[in-house]
Every structure is written in C-alpha cells, then in structure tokens.
C-alpha cells in the first residue's frame, strides 16, 4: 500500500520502515503496526486498509486476502549444521528475518476464505500484478488462499509478476526469475504468468 503513494514520500518511507534491534518490535514494519491498530479500532480489515490508503493519499484500493487472521509457517533449511534438516518457523517477522533459506510456506489456518471483493476484483481486472514484495511473506501467501488462486487461474487478465530489484536474504538470495516461477508453481501450479518484470 505504501508503494502506491507518490505525494506522501516521507510517510511512505515511515510505513515501510522496519524496526531494528532485538526488542519486541524488531523486524516489524511501521505500516503493519498502523494497519493493525486501525483494524482493532474499526473492527474491519477492509475499513482499516481504506483508512491507511487515505492517510497515504493512495488513489487505488488494497483489499486483504482474507477476513480471518492468518499466520505464515515456513519450511526453512540452513539453521542446523546439517543442511538437510528442515525446521518450521511460524510468524511473518520470523520468516522474513530468518537466517536460513525458506523452501516453502503455508498459511495457518490452511484454506482460509477470500475477503469480500477480492475474487470480484480479480475477475474484473484487465491486469493482475503479483509483487513486488517479500516473496514468501507477501506475494506467495496470496496464492495460498484457494478462492484467490482459482480466480487467478481463470481470469483472462494479463498476469504480471514483478520481481524485487534486490534479493532478500533468507527468502530470495540467489534466485533467478526462473526460480521465482518454480516456487510460484510449487505453491500454486494452476496459475500461469504472462509477463515477468
């Protein structure tokens, strides 16, 4: 959402800032905390996203992928002396900041419903853009919602995959565009991409 705002550059930078250090907020993005606070105040994730969009002066609209609270679980290698050992890490921040290499992710709970309006937005779109963003914690989770994956598979819209300019340690370090597609196929084999940027 913060990436959509041109007029409010300083706010955009603030929303994208991740806290450093080792405290309770370490690794958390300011924007996610603001969104969570607004969600608690309004009781509605869509209303909270609309409020964040208004704060940032965004012209478009962002919808949550699901109306239920979700967590991310990742299969990670490279955390033990034996590189074949796979450990499960749970939580967006833990996955995004792991010193290991993420191999696969899943949602908790699995098979959540899509949020109101998301499937309709995909069905009526001319172009659907996947990314940019944290590959395993922002992009892939969207295709793990069954209704969204089905909508992305059937839509006649052009599907554009936008890769990050720089790799993310633990998530996409050393990934080629082909590896990104391979991981997408592992998680959502029914989705074809038309363009990669």
Language-model region placement:
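Extended, charge-enriched "interface" segments that sit outside catalytic cores
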Residues: 196
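Conserved phosphate- and dinucleotide-binding cores of soluble alpha/beta proteins
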Residues: 1, 97-99, 108-115, 121-123, ...
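General "foldedness" signal
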Residues: 48, 52, 62, 66, ...
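Electropositive, gly/pro-rich neighborhoods at or near active sites that engage anionic ligands
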Residues: 1-100
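Adenine nucleotide phosphate-binding catalytic loops in nucleotide-utilizing enzymes
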Residues: 104
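Glycine-rich beta-strand-to-loop/alpha-helix junction loops that act as flexible
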Residues: 131-134
């Amino acid at each position: 959402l913060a990436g959509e705002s041109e007029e409010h550059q300083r706010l955009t930078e603030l929303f994208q800032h991740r806290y450093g250090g080792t405290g309770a907020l370490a690794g958390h993005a300011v924007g996610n905390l603001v969104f969570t606070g607004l969600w608690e105040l309004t009781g509605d994730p869509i209303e909270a996203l609309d409020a964040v969009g208004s704060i940032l002066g965004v012209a478009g609209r962002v919808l949550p992928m699901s109306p239920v609270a979700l967590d991310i679980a990742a299969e990670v290698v490279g955390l033990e002396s034996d590189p074949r050992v796979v450990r499960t890490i749970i939580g967006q921040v833990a996955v995004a900041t792991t010193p290991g290499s993420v191999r696969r992710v899943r949602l908790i709970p699995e098979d959540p419903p899509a949020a109101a309006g998301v499937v309709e937005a995909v069905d009526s779109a001319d172009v659907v853009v996947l990314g940019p963003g944290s590959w395993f914690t922002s992009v892939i989770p969207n295709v793990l919602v069954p209704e969204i994956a089905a909508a992305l598979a059937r839509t006649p819209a052009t599907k554009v995959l936008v890769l990050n300019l720089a790799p993310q340690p633990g998530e996409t370090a050393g990934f080629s565009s082909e590896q990104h597609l391979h991981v997408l196929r592992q998680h959502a084999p029914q989705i074809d991409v038309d363009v990669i940027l």
